[in-house]
């Protein structure tokens, strides 16, 4: 029996390194380090720069922040921690020259104990390998050199010097002055292809690929405005991605790409695929020579592909968008602060699919991935065209790749045919799983403010999980109000009075208030106020649950006020060039600033902005429309209900305070700014030093020091009252007692996506139709849409 136990124990020990290698964290940057701790006693603080396959494993390049120099670390399958190969290299920034590098080193020498001046000839900008040997580039002098490990430490061997360095720059032409400006470009990737070093160089549009002959430093380029990315491939070849169509940011994210194989030796380019979507390409992947496949990064998920069309989910990393390198058995992923290892083959893993219209909670996903390493998180971004109930239902009913969870950003510009949100239709059609089966969700939803709870519940069932809400509104600039000598009671609180206020400003105050504007600067105040009236009238009808028609006494009263409003002097002043006034003029009233969801700049006693409830007329109820909400919806056909429950619980646990403050009725926890205590401590240290100097100063100096003390104390007082809170106690009070009671969840409405209605508004702007004609034509349009 004893012998059998020993055999079992031995087998477990033999298997342990392999089991550990499936899920290793080789390094995580420590948290806040006490500045008083000597450098030699501090934990290693690394800023991870890159990872590359080399020397039978991988080499991690990292900056040791304690000693301000680059070090190289090695890991291979079977190891449980990285081994330091050596260090002392200088890390070249893109804008560095030999002079700035020398100055930086001299500064480090004065600050860092035991700092040794590095060899700036062999400084490192980027590091790569041919799979075994490390190659480094120093962009300051164009030197390319090898780095190898010997019994005496790391040794460098010069390979060649680039014949010119201008190819590593980016140039752009200023359209106003026609001048051409040149500055150092970012070098995104490097690969060794036989006797050539390929460098991906960022350009104004896409990239160019610089090919450096390692025998003599000669340079040639693969150019083209459509070239967007370069990957390593087999047998000295590169994979090139080219954008199909025009080059602009919109087409880059929504357009399609061609994929071709480029032979560095012959210059021949072979087309492999066309019409490849943006989501199929990233800048973080790695070629796997052991299997002839490519591992690519999809947020946290790693996929394996050979044709960049079909993908196989492999594993999930805790962090998003890691850069990876592969060994025979493992994938090593790095970001700025961590180094992770995951096995290529993790057996039967569950795939939890999340499709999102507006990003995801990084904290919740990271914690979920750490706690559930057997789960692959497959994340996909929903395009705007997919944000309708029919498309979402089709996705959830798909036989393959159907999402388990939808993260939907509900906004004013994503209406259904009846003007509702897609969520409303999904709930009506039975495409939302009842989440009341999850205790954490049930408890959370029971604590929601009523308007959010009512939006996701029907007959005691919970069909979505609200995780954030935000909206915009009217604000008074406290600073401008005080500079103008006004009181809050002087500011209009309805659109009728706003027209009269603008007229008074126009007739009497344009000269005196030349450095300020009543509203955000606009070429036409009449257009701006008309748009506000239309927007707020549509919202009022929705809040009051009355049919939307513009032929209504309240709307006509607003149109009469608009017709009487005078803005000629204001708009004339806007067009005048006055060298004494800056191009940007401060405004008194913001009409579209974020009110709900961002509480940092207002609502405390000394905030820079004052929330301004704005009614339509003096005689109607004031409403505030909250038009943006993010919810999680669960596919009723999911086969991963238990994992979904874990994910929802994680999202609730990691919810940020600003979201809780908006959503939860029982939220009462003020949040201090994370930087506040540090700043107060700095002020107090300064005051302590000034008082010490004052005690020891001669009499004639004491008064001057006292004046400085008074200035610092006043500055500390201002900082304390204005900058202390991220969420101030008065913010919570204002939101719960003033904003919420007048709030409603504003749906897009049937006019939200109407080109015909937008054309009518434009005709009013251009003076092509009268306000009376607008009322008549808009109501005809609404009647037609309602049929």
Language-model features: locations:
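Beta-propeller fold detector
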Residues: 25-32, 37, 81-91, 155-170, ...
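Glycine-centered hinge/linker elements that transmit conformational signals in sensory
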Residues: 502, 537-576, 603-617
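Conserved N-terminal structural module of periplasmic/extracytoplasmic solute-binding proteins
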Residues: 22-31, 41-53, 61-65, 78, ...
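Extracytoplasmic/periplasmic solute-binding protein
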Residues: 461-467, 472, 496-548, 584-590
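C-terminal capping/gating helix-and-loop segments adjacent to ligand/active sites or protein-protein/ligand interfaces
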Residues: 687-786
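Extracytoplasmic/periplasmic substrate-recognition and gating elements
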Residues: 603-700
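Surface-exposed loop and turn segments in beta-propeller and other repeat-based domains
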Residues: 37-40, 85-118, 158-182, 275-278
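Hinge/lid segment of periplasmic solute-binding proteins
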Residues: 412-471, 610-615
